[in-house]
Amino acid sequence: MKYFLEHNGKKYSDKDLIDAFYQLGIKRGDILCVHTELFNFGIPLLSRNEFLQTILDCFFEVIGKEGTLIMPTFTYSFCKNEVYDKINSKTKMGALNEYFRKQTGVKRTNDPIFSFAIKGAKEELFLKDTTSCFGENCVYEVLTKENGKYMTFGGQGHTLTHYAEEQFNVFYRYHKIFSGILIDENNISYNKTISYYVRKLDISSEPNLINIINIVNNTKNFKKNNFAG
């Protein structure tokens, strides 16, 4: 047992986190997509890398080698006219996600705007090329078809709503084409084009997070567990 976190004078161990995952119904063989906001949990008791590795170890302890772990590693590269380098483009999605994508055996999707880092038994299902960020063969489509699980770890924000918006062709968004240079894991550069279902700026369409949370909370598939902060 390893204590890795403290909040309000109470220390939390890796066993505590593993138990919390089990209480949520996470199990061996699961496909698990995780959005993270670690700063909400408390004060780390370990060095940066050991702290992050402890959390990753807890995920894999529960889902096992039969499971698959997915984390968003968004870069918005083509939106900023930047090259998307699958190995070197840093993610804007937090310290754990950036740490995870650099680990041995982790693979990254080709999406130059909304990429994901993936490791596990079914990783190849999620590595197909896509022509639209939230369209056919995107991570969220495969996650849905494979009955995967979606976790917000430390916060409530996520991009799953964007997938639903594109599937239902909402009136306040439209397809915008982005093009640029992608450098793959073999350091080979090539041109890529992708569609992103962006928001129409002349229409007020900010999502009502409270309503979304309430709708999700009322489904039989939603579970919540308080851990540390």
Where are these regions (language model features)?
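N-terminal and secondary-structure boundary signal
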Residues: 1-229
